[in-house]
C-alpha cells in the first residue's frame, strides 16, 4: 500500500500520498480579519483619540481631552440583528475632560459617540441585516522610492518620490541637461537647490560643502537663479500659490504646514520604518570603497582604513559605530539660518570613492538621516537632505532603485486600519465643530456634551460600511466562497489603483508573491491580477506587510530545524531558500550536495551549506481554494485559475458528498470558513437536537475532571443565504461524545462530516455520444435527477410594505378589488399567504390596496354609491405577487408592525416578508464543472437504460468529451478519474495534497491494488443496442459540482411588457421583463432574405409604434387583419434631436408633400382615446 492514513476530524480517514511531513499547522484562515479588528478596538481607537486631543479653542482658554473609551453590549444578538434588518453594533462611550485654563476648572463627562458596528466571530459585519465583508486593500507603502527613467534620446535619468500616508508628495528628477529638479505636490518643477536654500542652506558654498562636489549639482546651481534662503522661499511660494502676494513669513508657514506639521503630513509607523531602512547607511555603503578612514570617535582607534572595500564582514564590524546612540561616526549637527525651521539638523555622512570615476579619485558624500526616531511621523529636514543625497549617489551608481511591484513595497490595509482612517476623517470634522462651538458658547457654563457633535463621526462610519468599494456584500454561495471572500486582497478602492489605469506589470505574478499571494486564484476579465487571494500559510505583520513562514537552517550543523521564522518579502531577499521537496536525511540535513533553491528572482542550484531557510510546505504557495484542487501540479495554470474560481460558485446540494479524491484541505477550509459550528471548550455532549447542541464543559483541576457550565450552540435551519442558496446546519455529534476545543459540532451547507463537500462523486466516462457532447457539453444519466444527486434548495425573500401615502395609508387586507375568490384561497384573514402553501407565478403573496385619487364619478357609479354607501371606495390593487420563475413553497412569513414596537423605516406602518423555497433538480442548460477548470453545460439527460454500461452492468453517470482535455492541458482530471475509481473499489477516501500528491506511479499501483488494469480503461456497452463500443474507454470517479449559473434563473420570454419612456421601445433584460434587441446586424439578415413585412413589423408594431402596437393587439384578439404600421416613436425622437441641434428637418410623404408632425400626433391621440389607452404614460 502506498501512502499513510490521516485522520481529519472525528469522522473521516483518508489515505494520504504526501511524502513531506507537515512541520507547521495551518493558521486560522480568517485571522486576517479578526486580528485586525481586535487591534482596532484595543489600540487603533486609542491612537485616534490621542492624535486628536487636546482640542483647544483659538484663544487657548478651553481645552478638551479624550481620556478613555469603552464599548457597551450590543442591543441585539447576531441572529436577531439579521432578522430585524438592523446593524449588529455596540454603543461607544468616551470619557471626556474639559479644562478651563483661565479658572483651572476641570469637568469630566462620559459622552456617547454613536453605535459602532461589531465583527461577528466569523469575521463579518451585519449592516442593516445583511452580512458584509471588509476586503483588505493592497496599497503602495509610504516611503521614498527611486526609479530609473530612460528618456526619448536613450539617456539614463533617475526619478525619486517621497510618498506619505497622507500629505504632499515630494518628487526629484533629472532632465536631459543633467539638472536636478524637485516638484512639490505635483506642481511645476524647481531646481533642487531652491528647496535646499529654503531649508536654510542659503549659499552655493554651503550646498556644495554639504552634498559634495558633483557635476549634477554644478549644473543645477547654474540653472538656479535664487541666491539666498529668502528668495528661494518666495520662489517656492509663487509655485505653490500662484497669484498671491509672496512674503517670507507666508512662505515659511506654508512649507511648515505642507511637510512639518504632523496633523497635515503623516508617514505612519510603516512609512517611518521604510524611510529609515531605505536611507540607512548599511545598504548604501555595501561594497563601496572608503575615501576616509573610519575612526572610533571615543578612542580615536582606526576601524577601517581609507581605500578599504566595505564587504559584508567589514561592514558588520563598523556598523556598531554607525548605529550607536551617542558619538556616532560621521555625525554632524547643522544649524540652518533664515530657513523654514531654525532647529538644528542632525545628519550622518561618510565619504566614499565614486565608483563611476575611472581614476578612482573623485569623492562622493553619503548622507544618512541620523536615525530619526520611530515616533516622528512627519518628514524632517534630515530626511529631505538624505533622500536628496541618495538621489545624487544613485546618479553615480551608489544605492539601488526600487521595484514598486515587490511585496516589500506594497502593504495591506486590513479592516482595522481602513476603519481607523475612516474614523479619523469623522473625528477631524468633529474637531472643527468643537473649535467653533468653543468660541461661541459661554466658557463658564459649557459642558463637554454641549461641545461635541457626534453626527460627522457616525456619518463617516456609516458611509464606510454602506458604500465603500471595500465593504462588500458577502459571497455566501458556499463555505469556500465565504472563506475566500474574507481572505481577498484588492488593489482597487479609495487610495488604490483603478481598473483602467492599472498596467500589465501591476497585474503580473511577481517572485515576491511566493508564499504570500496566490499566483493562481484571481478573476478573469478586467480585474485580473488586481484582486488576489492570500496564500494558505501567510500572515500579516504589524506594518501590514505579508509574511511567509520558513524553516530555519542551522548554519553550524546544516540541520533543517523546526524553528519557524516569518519573513517579509524584503527580508527574504537576503536569504537563499530551499524548496519544501528537497530530500532530507534522518538527521534533517540535505541529502544532496547541490540543492535547488531560490534567491530573489532566480532559481539556482547551490551547495547545501549556503542555504539559510527551507519552505514549510509545498502548499504555502497557493491559496485556500487552489489548495482544494488535487493534482494541481498536472494542470495548466489558466485552467487551474478557472477551477479555483468555479469551486466558489458551487451550489450547496441537498445530500452533500465529500470528494473521494481530496487534498486534505477540505477539513481545514470547512472548519475555518464560519459555516460550521465550532466547539469553544472541551466537554461532553449532553443533548443534541436539530436546532441546538448542548455541551457540558469539562476542565482538569488537580488531575481530576470537574464539570463546568452548560453551553448552548444554536444551529441555523433553512435560512436564506446572501445569494439565495439554502443555509442549513446539521449536527454531526451524538449524546455522550467527548469533544475538544475547536472541534466541529455541526456541518454547514456544502459540508459532510466536517469536510467541505461542494459536489458529488460520479461515474464519468470520456467518450462522445451522438454528438451531444460537442463543445464541452455534458451528457448525464437520469439517475442523477431521480435520486436527487444534484438537487439543490433555493430560498427567495419577497417583501411588501404598507406606507402612508398622500391620499391615506395603504392597507394589507384580503379584500382586494377585482380578484376572484380562487386567487385568495391561500391567504389568511389579513390577506397574507399561509406557510406551506404552494404558489406559482402571479399568485398573491400579500394582499395590499392603495388609495386612489378621487376622480369624477360617472352616473352609474354615483347610483352604486347611493345604494351601497361607501363600499365602492377608490382603491387600487398593489398586492405582492410571485414574479416569473419564483414559484415554490412558502417556507416562512414574518410580519413587522409599528404598533408592536418594531423599528421600521419612516413612513412604513407594516412590513411583511415571505420566504419561498424551491427544490431545483438538475436539468438541461445547467452549468457543471470539475475542479480542474473543465466546465460545460448539460445538453441531454438520457434515461438510465440508454447510458453506456460497464461489463458488470453499472450504467455510467456522465459522459464528457475527450477532446476537452488535450488542448486545455488540464491532465489533473484524468489522474483524478483513475485514482477515484481505484479508491471507490477499495472503499477508501484519499488525499493528494497539491505539489506533493500521488505521482503517476502511485496511481497505477493503487489501481493494481484495486484489481483493475493499469491503464484504467474498460470495455463499455451501448445501452441501446447492448453492443460493445469499438475501443476501450477511460471510466472513473470524478468530483463534479453544480454551479450557480442555473438555466431557471436565465430562461426568459416576453409577450407584452414595460416600455422605455423616451423611445417607447421595450426594456432589456430579464429583471425588467424586457425584450430581445433586434440589432443592426439582424436587420441586415432580414434585408438579405428580402423579408420586408417581417422587418417592418419588428421595427414598428412589435417595438415603438405606440398606437400601432395597441391596434395590432386588438386586431389579434378580435381576429381582424393587422393594420398598417404608423411612425415609430424613436424616429420622432431622432427628428426632435436633429431639430434641437438647429437643423431644419422635414418629413415628406412618397409624393413629396410635407407631413406635419403635429397633425400626426393629434391623430394618434384621437386613436388612442378610442382604444382607451394613455399614450403619455409608459405602460
From Swiss-Prot:
Please list the GO terms describing molecular function. DNA binding; DNA-directed RNA polymerase activity; ribonucleoside binding
Gene3D superfamilies hit by this protein: 2.40.50.100, 2.40.50.150, 3.90.1100.10, DNA-directed RNA polymerase, beta subunit, external 1 domain, DNA-directed RNA polymerase, subunit 2, domain 6, RNA polymerase alpha subunit dimerisation domain, RNA polymerase Rpb2, domain 2
Write down the top EC class of this protein: transferase
Q: Which CDD domains match?
A: RNA_pol_B_RPB2
Give the enzyme's EC designation. Answer: 2.7.7.6
Name any GO cellular component annotation: DNA-directed RNA polymerase complex
Give yes or no: UniProt keyword Transferase: yes
Query: Which GO BP terms, alphabetically?
Result: DNA-templated transcription
> Which UniProt keywords are present, listed alphabetically?
DNA-directed RNA polymerase, Nucleotidyltransferase, Transcription, Transferase
Q: Which InterPro entries match?
A: DNA-dir_RNA_pol_bsu_ext_1_sf (IPR042107), DNA-dir_RNA_pol_bsu_external_1 (IPR019462), DNA-dir_RNA_pol_su2 (IPR015712), DNA-dir_RNAP_su2_dom (IPR007120), DNA-dir_RNAP_su2_hyb_sf (IPR037033), RNA_pol_bsu_bac (IPR010243), RNA_pol_bsu_CS (IPR007121), RNA_pol_bsu_protrusion (IPR007644)
Q: Which reaction is the catalytic activity of this chain?
A: RNA(n) + a ribonucleoside 5'-triphosphate = RNA(n+1) + diphosphate
Write out the function statement from the record.
DNA-dependent RNA polymerase catalyzes the transcription of DNA into RNA using the four ribonucleoside triphosphates as substrates.
Q: Output the HAMAP family linked to this UniProt entry.
A: RNApol_bact_RpoB (MF_01321)
Family membership noted in the UniProt record: Belongs to the RNA polymerase beta chain family.
Quaternary assembly = The RNAP catalytic core consists of 2 alpha, 1 beta, 1 beta' and 1 omega subunit. When a sigma factor is associated with the core the holoenzyme is formed, which can initiate transcription.
Q: What is this protein called?
A: DNA-directed RNA polymerase subunit beta
Q: What organism, scientifically named, is this protein from?
A: Oceanobacillus iheyensis (strain DSM 14371 / CIP 107618 / JCM 11309 / KCTC 3954 / HTE831)
Amino acid at each position: 500500500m502506498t501512502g499513510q492514513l490521516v485522520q481529519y476530524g472525528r469522522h473521516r480517514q483518508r489515505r494520504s500520498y504526501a511524502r513531506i511531513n507537515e512541520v507547521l499547522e495551518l493558521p486560522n484562515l480568517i485571522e486576517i480579519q479578526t486580528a485586525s479588528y481586535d487591534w482596532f478596538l484595543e489600540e487603533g481607537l486609542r491612537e485616534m483619540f490621542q492624535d486628536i486631543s487636546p482640542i483647544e479653542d483659538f484663544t487657548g482658554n478651553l481645552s478638551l481631552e479624550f481620556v478613555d473609551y469603552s464599548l457597551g453590549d450590543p442591543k441585539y444578538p447576531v441572529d436577531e440583528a439579521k432578522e430585524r434588518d438592523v446593524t449588529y453594533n455596540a454603543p461607544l462611550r468616551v470619557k471626556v475632560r474639559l479644562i478651563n485654563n483661565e479658572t483651572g476648572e476641570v469637568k469630566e463627562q462620559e459622552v456617547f459617540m454613536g453605535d459602532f458596528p461589531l465583527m461577528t466571530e466569523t469575521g463579518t459585519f451585519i449592516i442593516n441585516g445583511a452580512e458584509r465583508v471588509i476586503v483588505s486593500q493592497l496599497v503602495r507603502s509610504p516611503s521614498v522610492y527611486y526609479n530609473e527613467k530612460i528618456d526619448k534620446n536613450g539617456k539614463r535619468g533617475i526619478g525619486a518620490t517621497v510618498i506619505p500616508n497622507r500629505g504632499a508628495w515630494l518628487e526629484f528628477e533629472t532632465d536631459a541637461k543633467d539638472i536636478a529638479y524637485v516638484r512639490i505636490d505635483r506642481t511645476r518643477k524647481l531646481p533642487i537647490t531652491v528647496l535646499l536654500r529654503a531649508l536654510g542652506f542659503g549659499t552655493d558654498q554651503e550646498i556644495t560643502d554639504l552634498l559634495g562636489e558633483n557635476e549634477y549639482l554644478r549644473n543645477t546651481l547654474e540653472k538656479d537663479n535664487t541666491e539666498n534662503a529668502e528668495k528661494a522661499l518666495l520662489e517656492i511660494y509663487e509655485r505653490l500659490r500662484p497669484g498671491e502676494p509672496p512674503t517670507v513669513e507666508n512662505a515659511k508657514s506654508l512649507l511648515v504646514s505642507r511637510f512639518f506639521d504632523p496633523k497635515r503630513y503623516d508617514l505612519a509607523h510603516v512609512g517611518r520604518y521604510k524611510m529609515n531602512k531605505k536611507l540607512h547607511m548599511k545598504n548604501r555603503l555595501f561594497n563601496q570603497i572608503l575615501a576616509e578612514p573610519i575612526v572610533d570617535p571615543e578612542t580615536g582607534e582606526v576601524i577601517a582604513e581609507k581605500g578599504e572595500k566595505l564587504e559584508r564582514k567589514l561592514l558588520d564590524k563598523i556598523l556598531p559605530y554607525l548605529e550607536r546612540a551617542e558619538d556616532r561616526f560621521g555625525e554632524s549637527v547643522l544649524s540652518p539660518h533664515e530657513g523654514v525651521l531654525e532647529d538644528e539638523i542632525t545628519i550622518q555622512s561618510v565619504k566614499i570613492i565614486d565608483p563611476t570615476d575611472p581614476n578612482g579619485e573623485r569623492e562622493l558624500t553619503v548622507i544618512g538621516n541620523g536615525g530619526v526616531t520611530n515616533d516622528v511621523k512627519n518628514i524632517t529636514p534630515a530626511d529631505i537632505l538624505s533622500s536628496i543625497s541618495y538621489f545624487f549617489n544613485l546618479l553615480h551608481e551608489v544605492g539601488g532603485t526600487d521595484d514598486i511591484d515587490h511585496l516589500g513595497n506594497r502593504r495591506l490595509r486590513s479592516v482595522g486600519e481602513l476603519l481607523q482612517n475612516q474614523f479619523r476623517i469623522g473625528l477631524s470634522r468633529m474637531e472643527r465643530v468643537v473649535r467653533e462651538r468653543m468660541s461661541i458658547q459661554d466658557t463658564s457654563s459649557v459642558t463637554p456634551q454641549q461641545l461635541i457633535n457626534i453626527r460627522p463621526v457616525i456619518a463617516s462610519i456609516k458611509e464606510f460600511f454602506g458604500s465603500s468599494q471595500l465593504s462588500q456584500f458577502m459571497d455566501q454561495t458556499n463555505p469556500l466562497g465565504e472563506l475566500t471572500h474574507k481572505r481577498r486582497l484588492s488593489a482597487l478602492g479609495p487610495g488604490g489603483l483603478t481598473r483602467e489605469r492599472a498596467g500589465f506589470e501591476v497585474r503580473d505574478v511577481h517572485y515576491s508573491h511566493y508564499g504570500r499571494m496566490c499566483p493562481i486564484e484571481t478573476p478573469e476579465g478586467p480585474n485580473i491580477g488586481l484582486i488576489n487571494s492570500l496564500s494558505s500559510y501567510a500572515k500579516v505583520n504589524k506594518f501590514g506587510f505579508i509574511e511567509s513562514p520558513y524553516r530555519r537552517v542551522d548554519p553550524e550543523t546544516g540541520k533543517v530545524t523546526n524553528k519557524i521564522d516569518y519573513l517579509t518579502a524584503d527580508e527574504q531577499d537576503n536569504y537563499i531558500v530551499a524548496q519544501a521537496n528537497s530530500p532530507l536525511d534522518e538527521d534533517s540535513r540535505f541529502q544532496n550536495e547541490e540543492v535547488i533553491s531560490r534567491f530573489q528572482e532566480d532559481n539556482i542550484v547551490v551547495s547545501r551549506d549556503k542555504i539559510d531557510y527551507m519552505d514549510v510546505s509545498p502548499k504555502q504557495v497557493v491559496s485556500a481554494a487552489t489548495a482544494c484542487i488535487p493534482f494541481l501540479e498536472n494542470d495548466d495554470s489558466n485552467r487551474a485559475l478557472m477551477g479555483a474560481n468555479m469551486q466558489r460558485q458551487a451550489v450547496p446540494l441537498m445530500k452533500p458528498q465529500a470528494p473521494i479524491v481530496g487534498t486534505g484541505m477540505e477539513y481545514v477550509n470547512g472548519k475555518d470558513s464560519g459555516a460550521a459550528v465550532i466547539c469553544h471548550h472541551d466537554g461532553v455532549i449532553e443533548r443534541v437536537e436539530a436546532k441546538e447542541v448542548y455541551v457540558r464543559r469539562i476542565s482538569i483541576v488537580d488531575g481530576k475532571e470537574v464539570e463546568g457550565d452548560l453551553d448552548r450552540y444554536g444551529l441555523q435551519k433553512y435560512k436564506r443565504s446572501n445569494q439565495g442558496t439554502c443555509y442549513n446546519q446539521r449536527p454531526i455529534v451524538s449524546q455522550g461524545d467527548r469533544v475538544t476545543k475547536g472541534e466541529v459540532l455541526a456541518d454547514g451547507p456544502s459540508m459532510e462530516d466536517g469536510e467541505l463537500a461542494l459536489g458529488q462523486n460520479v461515474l464519468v466516462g470520456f467518450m462522445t455520444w451522438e454528438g451531444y457532447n460537442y463543445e464541452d457539453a455534458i451528457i448525464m444519466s437520469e439517475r442523477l435527477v431521480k435520486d436527487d444527486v444534484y438537487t439543490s434548495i433555493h430560498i427567495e425573500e419577497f417583501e411588501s410594505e404598507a406606507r402612508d401615502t398622500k391620499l391615506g395609508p395603504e392597507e394589507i387586507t384580503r379584500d382586494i378589488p377585482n380578484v376572484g375568490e380562487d386567487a385568495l384561497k391561500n391567504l389568511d384573514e389579513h390577506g397574507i399567504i399561509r406557510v406551506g402553501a404552494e404558489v406559482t407565478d402571479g399568485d398573491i403573496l400579500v394582499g395590499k390596496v392603495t388609495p386612489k385619487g378621487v376622480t369624477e364619478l360617472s352616473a352609474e357609479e354615483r347610483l352604486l354609491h347611493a345604494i351601497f354607501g361607501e363600499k365602492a371606495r377608490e382603491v387600487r390593487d398593489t398586492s405582492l405577487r410571485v414574479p416569473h420563475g419564483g414559484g415554490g413553497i412558502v417556507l416562512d412569513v414574518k410580519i413587522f408592525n409599528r404598533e408592536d414596537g418594531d423599528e421600521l423605516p419612516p413612513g412604513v406602518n407594516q412590513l411583511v416578508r415571505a420566504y419561498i423555497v424551491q427544490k431545483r433538480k438538475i436539468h438541461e442548460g445547467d452549468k457543471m464543472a470539475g475542479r480542474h477548470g473543465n466546465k460545460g453545460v448539460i445538453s441531454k439527460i438520457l434515461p438510465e437504460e440508454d447510458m453506456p454500461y460497464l461489463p458488470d452492468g453499472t450504467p455510467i453517470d456522465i459522459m464528457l468529451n475527450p477532446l476537452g482535455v488535450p488542448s486545455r492541458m488540464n491532465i489533473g482530471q484524468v489522474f483524478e478519474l483513475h485514482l477515484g475509481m481505484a479508491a471507490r473499489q477499495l472503499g477508501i477516501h484519499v488525499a493528494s495534497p497539491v505539489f506533493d500528491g500521488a505521482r503517476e506511479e502511485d496511481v497505477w499501483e493503487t489501481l493494481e491494488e484495486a484489481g483493475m488494469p493499469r491503464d484504467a480503461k474498460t470495455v463499455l456497452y451501448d445501452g441501446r443496442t447492448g453492443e460493445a463500443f469499438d475501443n476501450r474507454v477511460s471510466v472513473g470517479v470524478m468530483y463534479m459540482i453544480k454551479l450557480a449559473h442555473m438555466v431557471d434563473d436565465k430562461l426568459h420570454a416576453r409577450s407584452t411588457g414595460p416600455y422605455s419612456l423616451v423611445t417607447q421601445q421595450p426594456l432589456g433584460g430579464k429583471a425588467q421583463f424586457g425584450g430581445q434587441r433586434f440589432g443592426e446586424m439582424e436587420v441586415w439578415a432580414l434585408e438579405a432574405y428580402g423579408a420586408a413585412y417581417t422587418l417592418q413589423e419588428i421595427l414598428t408594431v412589435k417595438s415603438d409604434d405606440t398606437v400601432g402596437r395597441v391596434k395590432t393587439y386588438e386586431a389579434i384578439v378580435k381576429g381582424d387583419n393587422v393594420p398598417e404600421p404608423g411612425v415609430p416613436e424613436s424616429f420622432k425622437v431622432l427628428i426632435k434631436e436633429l431639430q434641437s441641434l438647429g437643423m431644419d428637418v422635414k418629413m415628406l410623404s412618397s409624393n413629396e408633400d410635407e407631413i406635419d408632425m403635429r397633425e400626426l400626433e393629434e391623430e394618434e391621440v384621437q386613436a388612442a382615446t378610442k382604444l382607451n389607452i394613455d399614450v403619455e404614460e409608459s405602460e
